[in-house]
């Protein structure tokens, strides 16, 4: 059988030893008492690795969970947040901002086009009072790749 390199967001290819490890029987972490000890120990080891005394948590979920976690961490009631919308994930930030009490301000473009740096610069000259901006580098549903090296310095 020919093995092709898979270059999509998922599923991803893994090394053979990882495939073998994943073939081992596993339990439901919600019901397995041993999992709690394993999880706690792993979080503590990550805290040591990061030289932090703060509590470390491992979030298990789809990639979009990271986007929501960022909004949950950064957004406070009434915060104005610039949501850069040129794809489904970009637009999705607006829902997360709203969910956590913020006021999303959408800066949208056609889903077939990356953001125009000059147009964004002109927009920000008129309205720039935002706590933070939400921008997706590669919005996979639309296939849009945003040039963060040029956009982020403006934000």
Question: At which residue positions do the language-model features occur?
Answer:
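A glycine-/small-polar-enriched, mobile loop at the entrance of the PLP active site in fold-type I
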Residues: 2-60, 64
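Generic recognition of short, well-ordered alpha-helical segments
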Residues: 17, 95, 145-147
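Conserved beta-loop-alpha segment that forms the PLP phosphate-binding cup at the N-terminus of a helix
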Residues: 53-95
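Structural motif
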Residues: 84, 107, 135-136
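Active-site-proximal loop->helix
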Residues: 92-105, 118-119, 123
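Short beta->alpha junction loops
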Residues: 108-113
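Active-site phosphate-binding strand-loop segment of PLP-dependent enzymes
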Residues: 115-155
């Amino acid at each position: 059988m020919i093995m092709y390199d898979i270059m999509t967001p998922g599923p991803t290819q893994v090394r053979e030893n990882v495939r073998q490890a994943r073939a081992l029987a596993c339990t439901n972490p919600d019901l397995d008492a041993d999992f709690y000890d394993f999880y706690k120990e792993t979080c503590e080891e990550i805290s040591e690795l990061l030289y932090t005394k703060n509590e470390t948590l491992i979030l298990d979920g789809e990639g979009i969970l990271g986007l929501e976690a960022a909004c949950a961490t950064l957004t406070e009631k009434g915060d104005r947040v610039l949501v850069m919308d040129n794809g489904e994930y970009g637009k999705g930030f607006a829902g997360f901002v709203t969910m956590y009490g913020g006021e999303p301000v959408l800066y949208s473009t056609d889903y077939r086009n990356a953001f125009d740096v000059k147009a964004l610069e002109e927009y920000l000259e008129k309205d720039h009072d935002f706590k933070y901006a939400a921008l997706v580098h590669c919005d996979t549903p639309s296939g849009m790749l945003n040039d963060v090296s040029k956009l982020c310095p403006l934000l």
